[in-house]
Amino acid sequence: MKVISDIDEVLTTTRAVRRRLNFERPVEREIVEECLRLAQQATMGSNIEDWRFVAVTEVAQKEKIAAVYRDVWDQTVEIPLRERRPDTVTRLDPGVRGDEASQARQKRVLSSVKYLVDNIERTPVIMFACSTKPVPKAALGDRASGYYGSIMPIAWSFMLALRSRGLGSVLATAIVYHAEKLSEILKLPADTHPITMIPIAYTDTLDFKPAPRRPLNEILRWEQWTD
């Protein structure tokens, strides 16, 4: 049942939810399917539904996923930050942020991600968005834009639909660092590749606010970039 009907509220308050997920309340399969059915109206490349989804609810499966997720955290965050690897420090370390407010915000983000890593198996439903498109050879150019542009719109639409019904979620893309292990756990066909994990749970409150963002004049130019 929809609990938020105002589209502007849904668009401005759909957050990456980790700490405020209610792990104790079951999530009905019907609601998950309803939200995904709505999200299927998202745009896609060449009007071909190359997306596939796997919803995980069984404890044994979630425990396997949790082990992979924790290893990804160790390999991509915990160890690189401890060893002060420059690329990771520049991207994630709160200390390199320009002001105290940004530093505090980054500390909260890292803390909330770690909370989800430590509790992922408690999430009622863990959804995986996958693609059957050929994997692009380059991160930019080639078919990369079409590859990700054909899966992220449905993933975001799915999150919006969840939010409108009182559920929280987050795009946990880092887990595909171990895409092969995930594919084995989920028994994906050879032509199907995991793109992102989306943990799903009811939220402990509906009271989410718009996040602070840069002024539009810092990110928008008309006709060409003039700075």
Model-derived features: where do they sit?
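N-terminal targeting/leader regions
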Residues: 1-26, 30-38, 47
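C-terminal helix-cap and adjacent tail motif
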Residues: 2-3, 13-19, 88-100, 193-227
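Small-aliphatic-rich amphipathic alpha-helix that forms the alpha element of a beta-alpha
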Residues: 35-40, 125-185
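Solvent-exposed alpha-helices and their adjacent loops that cap or buttress functional pockets
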Residues: 45-48, 118-121, 188-190, 212-213
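Short loop-to-beta-strand entry elements in the cores of soluble alpha/beta enzymes
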Residues: 46-57, 174
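Short, surface-exposed beta-edge/turn micro-motifs
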Residues: 50-51, 123-126, 194-195
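Glycine/small-residue-rich phosphate/adenosyl-binding loop
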Residues: 55-148
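A generic local secondary-structure boundary/capping motif
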Residues: 114-118, 159, 184-188, 210
